[in-house]
Amino acid sequence: MAKKRHILCPFCFNGFNNSEVEYQCENMERDSNGEYRCERDIDYNFNTHWKVEGTQVRHIFTPKKGFFSSFTGPSLEQEKSDRCGYPSRRFGCPHCHNWVPSNMIEEGSEIISVVGGPASGKTNYIVALMHQLRKYGHKLRLQVTPQQVYRDNHPEESTQNLFKNKDNQLFKDYQVLNKTAVEDTTQRIPWIFQLKHLDTKKTIYLVFYDTAGENFNDESSVSNNVKYLQYSEGVIVVLDTLSLNKIQEIIKSKGLSDLSDISTPIEDTGTTLNNFISNKAKELHKKPFAFVFSKFDTVLNNARDMGFSTDAFFDGSSFADSSYINSGKFDVQKIDEISDTIKGALCEYWNDGNEADFVSGAEANWGDNHKFFGVSSFGCMPSDAGELEEVKPYRVMDPLVWILYKLGGFDIQTINEPKKK
């Protein structure tokens, strides 16, 4: 008998109890004419979700429920299809009828979401983050698993396959990942990674959409594009360092980079995000928010020109990467120091009238439940052709590890405090 849990569908983001889960028939046998022995259905719920017509999918059926299941939890055992009698244990969302992985149904589906405006570097960041987490996660006893979530008959859309392709492009071919076209309005599959602590068994899911980014100039667009945001236990907001006016001025004066693809200004992000949360998801003010400035190597390598103190980032004569990569322990004081340094720059030298307001708004809305981070997905600036001499991600895991530390249950051991369970 499984524990009764509330589930959030990774496709439509409607909630349901796992006792309400539907089953999809797993019978793949065909008759002499090549037809499935368990006839496929043109499913209204599935087709409505994907905005298509006539797509045939596996037969979905409601399992038999015992009288006490509503009190004790669902069995989640194999059930025989009501059409062909084939034993199945493949679960489907009762709302959109998409396949939901069994571990989500059994263990729950708490999520951390990653959002960011167009050209913020969100896709490059998530690939670098997952690459580093798979490489160093064992130091924190964390296991990361890309999920096999995809539309029926489209396994190429799974997180595992999509991530592998982009990981190879970035870390083997040394090529910046292609930008997603802003006009691409395709209903996309979310990237979903399961994060699990090997000792406490605490599980959470990192959810990310490989789209052109949320339009933070428009609250209705945020509401439509990031419906999952309001159900998140924590949020990583990717901000483009190059979108800051003062940074743009300095970069242009040095001729360092083409700024034609800068992201949404942070003041627009702050205003729209705050309005969305205040109107539709007030509980998010109680959840940890990591404001992550991407492409931060631009600042660190030109700190003197940008009026930025690098003391919080240096260890002797070189930039210090995250402490847990070597020690397995999280340096809370270092995270505080970095956050305070970035906030100080936003309020002073980088302030162009709006940056300080963004900081004060974050402090008013989230208090101790927010931090600022500076990360680099590449560790260097790419060429105009998008080529990289090497790829050495810098501090990309910090925002996620900090959120896990704040949430508790992941046994994140620290240098400065007693370990927090």
PLM feature segments, named:
Residues 104-105, 134-178, 416-417:
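Flexible phosphate/Mg2+-sensing switch loops adjacent to catalytic phosphate-binding sites
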Residues 1-105:
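Long, basic/Gly/Ser/Thr-rich N-terminal segments
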Residues 67-74, 183-197, 201-235, 242-250, ...:
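Switch II of P-loop NTPase G domains
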Residues 121-122, 334-349, 379-418:
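Conserved GTPase G-domain signal focused on the G5
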Residues 13-16, 212-214, 241-245, 296-299, ...:
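Conserved nucleotide-binding/hydrolysis micro-motifs of P-loop NTPases
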Residues 197-200, 223-365:
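Conserved C-terminal guanine-recognition region of P-loop GTPase G domains, centered on the G4
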Residues 110-136:
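Glycine-rich phosphate-binding P-loop
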Residues 355-382:
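Beta-strand-loop-alpha "switch" segments that mediate conformational coupling across diverse proteins
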